[in-house]
């Protein structure tokens, strides 16, 4: 559906040294999926996203959307392709002197729709985003979440094939963010729109995306299924993002006073719901002290993570045997101490 091939964006001018915001990125985004791009500020996420609809023209590389080499277009052909790509922003960009209905109608008028078509389409799209009762309201009368819903309505009014989302929840509180993400997922499922969403928060990616690319320093350092990225991150930067999101850090003082073997245990799928630790306690006579733990559900798959301290009153070999048993029964075991 969307192919980025060796895309780079260099903001240097004249004889200035190279200033690469995006450095040789290649991605293949499948039709109908919700694809995330995550990274910290300055990673190049927004710049990369804007190459998809050519709001930012690549310095080098190719951008194809639905088989069309959009990076080579200009003028009317480019405008026609952009009508197939909706976009929402973190700061809404609504027209303050126009009602909700007029804001949505504006994008339809710009696409050349007739008044009759607009009259039919606007109520339909406002119903989809849950704003039927706000049709006559002005942006100043809306909450942040409602403003973003108007932005979404405007972006999908012309039935785009692709919806680009530039940090759509960063200006919203947690509850409102969750509602907006649920709406985006609903739109993806109902309308089949391919969504590309960027965020600096892995929690946003976890909530709504099917696959994700991790960016830092203008490069994609890791890409894959969201569950796999959380379960087995490969790159150090990805591990840092995941660890921060899952909040598994232990106080340094606690680590200093530990006696025994400290494990971080990853449970995937059915193993996340099995009594693995109670089994080893019974079988090997070890004491199991759980210091931290949680089960996350990513999509319909369970990911359990526990930090546990294993001790035995007299036989350290029993602890080693217990660790081996846990390794067989679970996806991954990391010895943190001991």
Swiss-Prot record:
**ABC transporter domain segment(s):** 2-242
Q: Which reaction(s) does the protein catalyse, per the Swiss-Prot or TrEMBL entry?
A: L-methionine(out) + ATP + H2O = L-methionine(in) + ADP + phosphate + H(+); D-methionine(out) + ATP + H2O = D-methionine(in) + ADP + phosphate + H(+)
Its Gene Ontology cellular component terms are:
plasma membrane
What the entry lists under Gene3D superfamilies is as follows: 3.30.70.260, P-loop containing nucleotide triphosphate hydrolases
CDD domains, alphabetized: ABC_MetN_methionine_transporter
Q: Could you tell me the EC number(s) of this protein?
A: 7.4.2.11
Q: Name one Pfam family in it.
A: NIL
Principal cellular location given in the protein's record? membrane
Keyword entries, A-Z:
Amino-acid transport, ATP-binding, Cell inner membrane, Cell membrane, Membrane, Nucleotide-binding, Translocase, Transport
Q: Which SUPFAM superfamilies match?
A: ACT-like, P-loop containing nucleoside triphosphate hydrolases
Binding sites annotated in the UniProt record for ATP? 39-46
Q: What Gene Ontology molecular function terms does this protein carry? A: ABC-type D-methionine transporter activity; ATP binding; ATP hydrolysis activity
Q: Which family does it belong to?
A: Belongs to the ABC transporter superfamily. Methionine importer (TC 3.A.1.24) family.
Its biological purpose is as follows:
Part of the ABC transporter complex MetNIQ involved in methionine import. Responsible for energy coupling to the transport system.
Name this protein carries in UniProt: Methionine import ATP-binding protein MetN 2
């Amino acid at each position: 559906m969307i192919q980025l091939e060796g895309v780079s964006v260099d903001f240097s001018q004249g004889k200035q040294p190279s200033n690469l915001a995006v450095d040789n990125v290649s991605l293949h985004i499948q039709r109908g999926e919700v694809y995330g791009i995550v990274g910290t500020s300055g990673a190049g996420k927004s710049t990369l996203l804007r190459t998809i609809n050519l709001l930012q023209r690549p310095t080098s590389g190719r951008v194809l959307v639905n088989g069309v080499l959009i990076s080579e277009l200009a003028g009317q052909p480019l405008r026609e392709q952009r009508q197939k790509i909706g976009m929402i922003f973190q700061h809404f960009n609504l027209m303050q002197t126009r009602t909700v209905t007029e804001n949505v109608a504006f994008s339809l008028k710009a696409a050349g729709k007739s008044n009759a078509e607009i009259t039919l389409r606007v109520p339909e799209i406002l119903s989809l985003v849950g704003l039927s009762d706000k049709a006559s309201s002005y942006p100043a009368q809306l909450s942040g979440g409602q403003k973003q819903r108007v932005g979404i309505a405007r972006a999908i009014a012309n039935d785009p094939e692709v919806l680009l989302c530039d940090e759509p929840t960063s200006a919203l509180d947690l509850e409102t963010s969750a509602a907006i993400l649920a709406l985006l997922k609903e739109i993806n499922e109902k309308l089949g729109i391919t969504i590309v969403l960027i965020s600096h928060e892995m929690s946003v990616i976890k909530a709504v995306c099917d696959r994700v690319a991790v960016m830092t320093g203008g490069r994609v350092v890791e890409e894959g299924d969201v569950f796999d990225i959380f379960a087995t991150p490969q790159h150090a930067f990805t591990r840092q993002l995941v660890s921060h999101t899952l909040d598994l850090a232990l106080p340094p003082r606690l680590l200093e006073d530990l006696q025994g073997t400290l494990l971080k245990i990853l449970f995937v799928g059915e193993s996340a719901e099995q009594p693995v630790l109670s089994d080893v306690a019974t079988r090997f006579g070890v004491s199991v002290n759980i210091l931290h733990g949680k089960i996350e559900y990513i999509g319909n798959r369970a990911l359990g993570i526990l930090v546990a301290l294993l001790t035995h009153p007299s036989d350290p070999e029993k602890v080693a045997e217990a660790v081996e048993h846990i390794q067989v029964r679970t996806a991954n075991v990391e010895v943190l101490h001991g």
